[in-house]
Amino acid sequence: MKAKLCLHGVDVKHQAQLVGLVKKLLPSAKVSYKVKEKYFPDNDMYKCRVARFQPKSKGAGYRVLCSWGVLLVSDKLVNVADITLEFARDNAAAVAAVRLLLEQLLAGKQHFVLDEPDLARRLDLLRGRYYLDNLEGYDRERATTALCCHVPWQLYSINKLWEQLLWGGGIQRTLWRQLRVKLRRLRSVLSLVKPLFSAADYWKELVKKQADVLSDVREYDVLLQTCERLRLHGGSLEQAKHLSQQQSPLIVQKTGGVNGSGLQLQQLLQGMRQQAQVRSVGQLQLNAVTHELASLLLALQQAAGEHCDMSLQSFFSRRFRSWGRKLVALPWQENDMRDMEQLHKVRIKLKRFRYALQSVPEMAASPQLLLSLKYLQDMLGLLHDDYVNEQYLAQLVAAHDELPELRYEVAMLRGWERAKADAALEQLTGQWQEFSLLLSEWIEELE
């Protein structure tokens, strides 16, 4: 079956740049030109000029398309500046040629990100109505549909966020969190499809390395956000209660107000965050990230062509039954609840389960189960952050004796966080029991 891999040029100014790149790599290829356009009932449309490069060697098994034009989506023009590689995924020589072309294209001066090759589906993606069962390769009778439909769109989104973060110098703080969440979700889905994708562990580790680049900055952002909330809401008990309830409806703040603005701590963290940002952004180049994600997509497309007798629904049901039973069977005892290392492992399992479940619309889990799962994950996250921050802030105070107010400010922050963590801990057993009951009922429905 034919597979497609699309590279969108983020800094390409005209079609000649795209055509020139491909002509240099495929000098003997036959070139033909065609105009593609399509209009949709909601006034969206696309129109572009396509140059097709067909290698002259018989049975090459691949071709390259250079597309230049525009999409009109919600009255907004979006550039089309694509190099699309079409190839037979069961042809080893064609796959090898595509792999080499990827390496050569991404080694140049032009910058690329992955994008949806089908322009009609790209419009859907931009409008937020990207339905997997509309994709060309979607087949309910084949479990390997998960590889070619449930993962690629996540790669497109991650690659574009990397573009925004790296090209923007990391200034937009929300991008750091969004990217970390999407990388975690990708790792969760790779775990889910592991029986279909033997190289899943290798690619999960590579994705983890990308996420690790973001971790230091994100940790500083969490602390800075807490400092700001403490400064804004610390003077009033009712405000503190309101703030805590915003973080989680199940966590009730029990402490009174805290005075002080924590300026020394905040300024120190901001400086350290800026240093971490410069280090993180300097570690990666956009084309290097794109090459890693494109290589993962290529590996997924190859694996999707392998024989599989199981249907998509049967595969997902079996996997989630297995994961769900393991969660329900976790030993949950009162004396384990202050073992933060153990709770962190449980939290990782819950996050993996939730992110994977959210990525599989075919399973249609109940809103009550998803909400209970999120509350439980939030509680464990609050406990873990409190545990990690306690150790980090103690080291920070010890390293800065020259700041006399720092110890006082850290003590205020720790007291505020500790009270929230204690409140979460009181609710934890009841929330776990509720989640386990809902999960057990859902597992029975999957039988």
Question: Which residue stretches match the model-derived regions?
Answer:
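Function-determining surface determinants
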Residues: M1-E447
